[in-house]
Design a protein with these regions (language model features):
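Bacterial N-terminal signal peptides
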Residues: 9-20
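Ser/Thr/Pro/Gly-biased, low-complexity, turn-/loop-rich segments
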Residues: 2-4, 22-182
């Protein structure tokens, strides 16, 4: 009897830790999210309205920022942009600038293949392949849910890999639902 209680307690604890690690991994990936063209960000410098702005990153990935000139933001995280602007404003312009950068709107993801309405859709954090397909009107009758691929750009290189319907997508992903052959 006590042996069974120990087993159940151990199993419950193992599941709890697995869920905690999984949740932490999801948060970690969004904190390491690299900005790309199409993302809308808000740059705020406390008490400095002329240095605060909301902007969509253009295709070239650079913005003109007051006093600092052209800044290339594509491939950087929000924290790295904060640091870049903080360091640039520190000393010559402000004594101790309070800079924050937030992602207001992520770039869209694209879904094609065997979905009813292929195209680009706004990304939302926590979006799985299944939810993305639902946004695209659902799967067609010929969809092979076991043959789904994602093309994702990381550090300037494109990678293609197979995923399941429960895997999470990221902004800018191209999801392809392949056709099932009867």
């Amino acid at each position: 009897m006590i042996s069974n209680i120990k087993k159940i307690s151990f199993l419950t604890l193992a599941i709890f830790w697995s869920v905690c690690l999984w949740a932490q991994e999801g948060n970690l990936s969004m904190s390491q999210y690299q900005l790309g063209s199409g993302d809308r960000i808000n740059i705020s410098v406390f008490g400095q309205d002329d240095l605060s702005m909301e902007i969509r990153l253009p295709d070239v990935g650079t913005i003109n920022y007051p006093f600092l000139g052209e800044l290339k933001l594509v491939g950087m995280t929000a924290a790295e942009v904060e640091s870049l602007i903080y360091e640039g404003l520190l000393g010559d312009y402000l004594v101790n600038p309070s800079v924050s950068v937030a992602i207001v709107e992520y770039r869209p993801f694209f879904i094609d293949g065997e979905v009813k309405r292929p195209g680009g859709y706004p990304y939302q954090p926590g979006l799985s392949v299944n939810k993305a397909a639902a946004l695209a009107g659902g799967y067609t009758e010929r969809a092979n849910k076991d043959k789904i691929t994602i093309v994702r750009e990381t550090d300037g290189q494109q990678f293609e890999f197979s995923v399941s319907v429960t895997d999470m997508i990221q902004p800018g992903d191209i999801v392809t639902v392949n056709q099932r052959f009867f």
